[in-house]
């Protein structure tokens, strides 16, 4: 692809940014990306700054930031708000660690249930199904 990333149509822009056209339009509706003026009788054009912005959004998404959080990061992107950006990242890191702990607990329980399923003999009820039914019963009895 050419290195000239100026004066791009939306299709070429989307390809350069590694997304599809609908993603570009979605980001515009969400306020993450500007919608360029449409010259009379012509089509909108995008430039390198737009490509960089979309790549920023995608990078932030890969780190788990929501679109609202990304909008806040974009607001801070002049490089002078490192403390605020760091605070956002610390909150995200806390969320990630909590999710990892939840996943570890889920893995332990599932592993135990799989072992119990493999260890069962005869026509005994499936430990996994019994456990899930027990949880469902507890949830029903807790309802008002």
Swiss-Prot record:
GO terms for molecular function: DNA binding; DNA-binding transcription factor activity; mercury ion binding. Disulfide bonds: none annotated. It comes from the Bacteria. Hg(2+) binds at residues 82, 117, 126. Residues 10-29 bind DNA. One of its GO terms (biological process) is response to mercury ion. Pfam families: MerR, MerR-DNA-bind. This is Mercuric resistance operon regulatory protein. It comes from Shigella flexneri.
